[in-house]
Amino acid sequence: MYVARLSTRPLSNPSTAQLSKAAAFFAQSYALPSTKCTAHVPSRRPFTSGAKIQVKGRDLFPEPXHGQIKRTEPAWPHPPYSVEQMRSKVYFAHRKPRDFSDRVALGMVRFLRWCTDFATGYKHNVEAPKTASDSNAVTATKPYQMSERKWLIRYVFLESVAGVPGMVAGMLRHLRSLRGLKRDNGWIETLLEEAYNERMHLLTFLKMYEPGLFMRTMILGAQGVFFNSFFLCYLFSPKTCHRFVGYLEEEAVLTYTLSIQDLENGHLPKWADPNFKAPDLAIEYWGMPEGHRSMRDLLYYIRADEAKHREVNHTLGNLKQDEDPNPFVSVYGKEVADKPGKGIESLRPLGWEREEVI
């Protein structure tokens, strides 16, 4: 067996000085404290070696400095949500499967949920929602094991893959429109906007938490597997894929409902601190008003987004994929009082039936 031969000669004074300068530069760049070497205690934190960077630390994506460009406006401005709408119209709801396609989609979501819970070490003190219309639809039955850090681990991982379905579906419909030499009837824009919105969720949480190397590797693998799997499935059955995303967003609404309840019940004291504010990126994107910029308010905004995605995908799963227009960007007559749109004024948790919108 080949073994590399190492030199045992002591370093010269110039070499020692160079190593000292390099170590000092590294410590200064990453804001490391200047202390003596101590025994390393292995971390028991699952899935990540990251650290919270809300107030102090290294910004993962600082604002670039350009000479003439002052700011870049979002490609899809976020529709306004009122506080009353987010708290009264958004709640956990489950659409019961009606055919084999729905059951396949629901089964895949439940399997994915189990895999994600196992990978992120997610454990909560609940069993099941009480009722579909209860915004606090949980019952505590187990010892509480979550924390702010564990919630951020879950948020970052989930949002890193949540933006995949909209991008894949929009890309495939775009390519089909090109090769078919026909219009898409407004689906592409809504799907790409959904992917953009999920990415903004991820960027918001990355302003509060920096994932470690292991988590980055897991995200890379999960994205590769999920992208290719969803790509192939959408080629064969786009209806099943939209139903899958609808059920996936049901789980997202439940996840954020649980975290909001934890915060309101005092289990997450760091986020309940009045000095803990939402990142500037989130305040600008959602247009969060003064007095409603806390972590609790941020979770309400994100949960409302997930509820909107749930409505959109359950609705798209009810339509004829090749010929029906997208009802969320369509213009209806004045005689139609209740109609879908980009906001949550007429939110339907289980989606719109085809007969209601076409």
Swiss-Prot record:
Sites where the protein binds Fe cation 1: E159, E198, H201, E306
Transmembrane region(s): 152-172, 218-238
Gene Ontology CC entries for this record: mitochondrial inner membrane
Protein's UniProt keywords contain Transit peptide: yes
Cofactor: Fe cation
Pfam families: AOX
Membrane topology note: Multi-pass membrane protein
One GO molecular-function entry: metal ion binding
Group of enzyme by EC: oxidoreductase
Annotated residues for binding of Fe cation 2: E198, E249, E306, H309
Cofactor, how bound (note): Binds 2 iron ions per subunit.
InterPro entries registered for this protein in UniProt: AOX (IPR002680), AOX_sf (IPR038659)
Alphabetized UniProt keyword annotations: Electron transport, Iron, Membrane, Metal-binding, Mitochondrion, Mitochondrion inner membrane, Oxidoreductase, Respiratory chain, Transit peptide, Transmembrane, Transmembrane helix, Transport
Keyword Iron: yes
EC id: 1.-.-.-
Family listed: Belongs to the alternative oxidase family.
Function description: Catalyzes cyanide-resistant oxygen consumption. May increase respiration when the cytochrome respiratory pathway is restricted, or in response to low temperatures.
This protein's name: Alternative oxidase, mitochondrial
Species this chain originates from: Monilinia fructicola (Brown rot fungus)
